[in-house]
């Protein structure tokens, strides 16, 4: 039987030739010796003939970080590794030189090879070996067996490391003594050959700025060690003398910039080296290096940086008078860096009464420093941007109060001066009985009018200090209506609603049918509230639409004479704004659910137009979570609030989910679901709402697009960020982020990243990590909310059902609110 073998065709031959040409070119470029084989990552030299006489280096003498392994064996003519030879291979990790003629390793041989992890120098001609080539390397293995070491002090360092079990495995290393006797290295004894020691004269170096100090370093060891000082980043002038023992270091005119630096004394001989260190503490007078006008964050903050040692005491002054701090206005130190303190004066909901000059005084026993900054938080009422005031009714009497106690930082408002009609003198005792009766009747009627007219004016009543200082809000949600499904819709069009800082078009979802005014529920009836039944107490905040006040509302509920409410005003009196106002009121009237903030009605008697919502005692959920988290002790004074339990977190989460189920059933898309837009009432009752104020209070949560639009991108899915597409599925994504907020006690999502970095992470498919206190079942639920494709996300009803089941499995105790 004849077998046929196909001969290589010309194409295959050409390919093989090309490969050989490429390999040959690379080999030539590297300068690979004849006894070596070279690749892009490895050099292998094991052929004894013709052999190599020096360590292989690249022909172009440029650094190469691709080669990670060099293996050399059977090279009897290779006797040394010199400076700058191995240094060309900066990426080298493994070096093997075995069964060769190696006699010498330069002390600078591996100075550039910081990645070296493994060195094997076995079976060579090494009679001595210094420690210096290896002291800066983080080696996992250094193998030195079967070398003709000579018993001397120079190899004592190898014994010391063997004794301290520096290597993963003990090695049988031998040396030859003066009698040509071969002994184990571990049994080697060399007189006057010890590891040196070093001791500083002072380990608590303290000096006043501008003074001088001298430090001594006493060393011992055999052979006598060389001494050096390590003075990294030392700014002050200094002199050292290491020619005698003890060595000395004198620092002159010490600078405060050197406070906190470490000063080290190093003693080194051929056995090894030791280092001892002490921290330099410089005492100096305070210096306020930075102070700036207030910036809005979660609270208003006047930022500052103060240097000083000992730690300066800080005192604030307002308009020249001492500012007594309280829970509403206090100094917070955020970062301490040696003797540098970064912090701010934090003000909770300041008003125009807090405008003025603030002076910071920093003082310690070495001196003091002060800096002043002007602060403007709010315009004075009555200048066109203040709250609604009837000048004929109210007289504002401002008393210079202690601004530190914000519960007393309100205008003292006098009640209307009710003038009682003076009693008319009797002209004669003979006035007819009929006229007397008529006068009495008139007086009775006047008294009745005065009695029931006391609440007939819409304005602020009484000092605001009697009301809780919590911020609370609720707001319109967004119904999916017919119109353009692009963000380029006319801002002033009929489908635009006021959202925080701007008007944003209502986005159409083609899966739903739109709803117009004619399609509202037939029984839709917006309750109208008389203006004289609304009495403002204090301002809660301000959005683009206008201001929000805490108020008392009379005759709203049959069972109560008056109740606390949140009042939202409309400052824009244009026709379009009024149309939006009425349309919004009709939509809100249809939202009736136990976990949606209740809308009571409107007041349209005169200007401004007013919406009335229920008031939630404990404010927004984000502040509530922070106040009941592990970091609450950093923010609170006095008793620390009780920390939320896992079951209470689940109870909160399932209430929010219940509210979102209802909104989805009504074809509403929230578009700004976050803990800052949820409110907390009695017995851990949580409701969804939003006055739009959160864009002012939580400004860092929003990303400004163009000149006006602010988007909560940390809560938005990819399709909303990239295409401005808002649907029930995008609300599901936001609900997952809300769950993450709850189980982190109110942390900001992606708090470690800038807004641009957050956009990049979300659009690239990254998700938030599992919170430390979060059960796996809840995190799996979060991941179900964060699927990139909207149709792959969990259904809102599924989420509510899962949270309900988890909450039922863990009973809730509601005494957290006291």
From Swiss-Prot:
EC class of the enzyme, as a word: transferase
Cystine crosslinks: 32-38, 36-45, 151-175, 153-193, 217-265, 301-344
Chief location bin: membrane
Biological process, per Gene Ontology: brain-derived neurotrophic factor receptor signaling pathway; cell surface receptor protein tyrosine kinase signaling pathway; cellular response to brain-derived neurotrophic factor stimulus; central nervous system neuron development; cerebral cortex development; collateral sprouting; learning; negative regulation of neuron apoptotic process
Positions of transmembrane segments: 427-450
Recorded catalytic activity of this chain's protein: L-tyrosyl-[protein] + ATP = O-phospho-L-tyrosyl-[protein] + ADP + H(+)
Active site positions: 672 (proton acceptor)
InterPro entries: Cys-rich_flank_reg_C, Ig-like_dom, Ig-like_dom_sf, Ig-like_fold, Ig_I-set, Ig_sub, Ig_sub2, Kinase-like_dom_sf
Region spans: Provides specificity for BDNF as ligand versus NTF3 and NTF4: 384-394
Residue ranges that the UniProt entry lists as topological domain Cytoplasmic: 451-818
Compartment list: Cell membrane; Endosome membrane; Cell projection, Axon; Cell projection, Dendrite
Extracellular side of membrane: 32-426
Signal peptide from the UniProt entry: 1-31
Regulation acting on activity, per entry: The neuronal activity and the influx of calcium positively regulate the kinase activity and the internalization of the receptor which are both important for active signaling. Regulated by NGFR that may control the internalization of the receptor. NGFR may also stimulate the activation by BDNF compared to NTF3 and NTF4. The formation of active receptors dimers able to fully transduce the ligand-mediated signal, may be negatively regulated by the formation of inactive heterodimers with the non-catalytic isoforms.
Residue stretches of biased makeup (Polar residues): 400-418, 481-491
Domain Protein kinase: 534-803
Name of the protein: BDNF/NT-3 growth factors receptor
Source organism per UniProt: Gallus gallus
Lineage of origin: Eukaryota, Metazoa, Chordata, Craniata, Vertebrata
């Amino acid at each position: 039987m004849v077998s046929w073998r196909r001969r290589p065709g010309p194409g295959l031959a050409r390919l093989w030739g090309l490969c050989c040409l490429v390999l040959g070119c690379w080999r030539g470029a590297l300068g690979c010796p004849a006894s070596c084989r070279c690749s892009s990552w490895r050099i292998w030299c094991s052929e004894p003939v013709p052999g190599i006489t020096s360590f292989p280096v690249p022909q172009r003498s440029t650094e190469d970080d691709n080669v990670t392994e060099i293996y050399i064996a059977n090279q009897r003519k290779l006797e040394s590794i010199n400076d700058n030879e191995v240094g060309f291979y900066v990426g080298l990790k493994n070096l093997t030189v075995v069964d060769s003629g190696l006699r010498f390793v330069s002390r600078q041989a591996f100075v550039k090879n910081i990645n070296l992890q493994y060195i094997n120098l076995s079976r060579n001609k090494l009679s001595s070996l210094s420690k210096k080539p290896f002291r800066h390397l983080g080696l996992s293995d250094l193998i030195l067996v079967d070398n003709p070491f000579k018993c001397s002090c120079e190899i004592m360092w190898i014994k010391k490391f063997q004794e301290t079990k520096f290597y993963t495995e003990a090695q049988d290393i031998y040396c030859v003594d003066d009698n040509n006797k071969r002994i184990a290295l571990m049994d080697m004894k060399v007189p006057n050959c010890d590891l040196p020691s070093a001791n500083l004269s002072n380990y608590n170096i303290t000096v006043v700025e501008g003074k001088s100090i001298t430090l001594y370093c006493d060393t011992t060891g055999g052979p006598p060690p060389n001494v050096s000082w390590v003075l990294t980043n030392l700014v002050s002038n200094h002199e050292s003398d290491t020619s005698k023992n003890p060595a000395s270091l004198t620092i002159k005119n010490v600078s405060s910039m050197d406070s906190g630096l470490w000063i080290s004394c190093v003693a080194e001989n051929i056995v090894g080296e030791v280092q001892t260190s002490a921290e330099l503490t410089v005492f100096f007078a305070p210096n306020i290096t930075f102070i700036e006008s207030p910036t809005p964050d979660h609270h208003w903050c006047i930022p500052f940086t103060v240097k000083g040692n000992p730690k300066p005491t800080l005192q604030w002054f307002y308009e020249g008078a001492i500012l007594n701090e309280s829970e509403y206005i206090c100094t917070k130190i955020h970062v301490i860096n040696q003797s540098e303190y970064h912090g701010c004066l934090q003000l909770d909901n300041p008003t125009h009464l807090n405008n003025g000059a603030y002076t910071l005084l920093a003082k310690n026993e070495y001196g003091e420093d002060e800096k002043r900054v002007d602060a403007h938080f709010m315009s004075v009422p009555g200048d066109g941007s203040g709250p609604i005031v009837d000048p004929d009714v109210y007289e504002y009497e401002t008393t210079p109060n202690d601004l530190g106690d914000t519960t007393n930082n309100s205008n003292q408002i006098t009640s209307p001066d009710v003038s009682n009609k003076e009693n008319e003198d009797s002209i004669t005792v003979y006035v007819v009985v009929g006229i007397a009766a008529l006068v009495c009747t008139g007086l009775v009627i006047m008294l009745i009018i005065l009695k029931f007219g006391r609440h007939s004016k819409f304005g602020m009543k009484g000092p605001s200090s009697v009301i809780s200082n919590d911020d609370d809000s609720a707001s319109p949600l967004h119904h999916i209506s017919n119109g353009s499904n692009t963000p380029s819709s006319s801002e002033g069009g009929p489908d635009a609603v006021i959202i925080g800082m701007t008007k944003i078009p209502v986005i159409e979802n083609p899966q739903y049918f739109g709803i117009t005014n004619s399609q509202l529920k037939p029984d839709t009836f917006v309750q109208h509230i008389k203006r004289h039944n609304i009495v403002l107490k204090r301002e809660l905040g301000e959005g683009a639409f206008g201001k929000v006040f805490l108020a008392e509302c009379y005759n709203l509920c049959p069972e109560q004479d008056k109740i606390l409410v949140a009042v939202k005003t409309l400052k824009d009196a244009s026709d379009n704004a009024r149309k939006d106002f009425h349309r919004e009121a009709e939509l809100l009237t249809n939202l009736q659910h136990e976990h949606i903030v209740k809308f009571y009605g409107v007041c349209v008697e005169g200007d401004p137009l007013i919406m009335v919502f229920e008031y939630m005692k404990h404010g927004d959920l984000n502040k509530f979570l922070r106040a009941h988290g592990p970091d609450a002790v950093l923010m609170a004074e006095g008793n620390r609030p009780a920390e939320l339990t896992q079951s209470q977190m689940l109870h909160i989460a399932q209430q929010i989910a219940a509210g979102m189920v209802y909104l989805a059933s009504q074809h509403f898309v929230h578009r700004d679901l976050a803990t800052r837009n949820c409110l907390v009432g009695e017995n851990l009752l949580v409701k969804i709402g939003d006055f739009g104020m959160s864009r002012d209070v939580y400004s860092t949560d929003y990303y400004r697009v163009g000149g006006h639009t602010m988007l909560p991108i940390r809560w938005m899915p990819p399709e909303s960020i990239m295409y401005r597409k808002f649907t029930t599925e995008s609300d599901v994504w936001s609900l997952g982020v809300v769950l993450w907020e709850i189980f982190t006690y109110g942390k900001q999502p992606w708090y470690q990243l800038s807004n641009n970095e957050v956009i990049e992470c979300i659009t690239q498919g990254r998700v938030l990590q599992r919170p430390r206190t979060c059960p796996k079942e809840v995190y799996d639920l979060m991941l179900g909310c964060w699927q990139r494709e909207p149709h792959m996300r969990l259904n809102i009803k599924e989420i509510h059902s899962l949270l309900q089941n988890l909450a039922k499995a863990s009973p809730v105790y509601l005494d957290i609110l006291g």
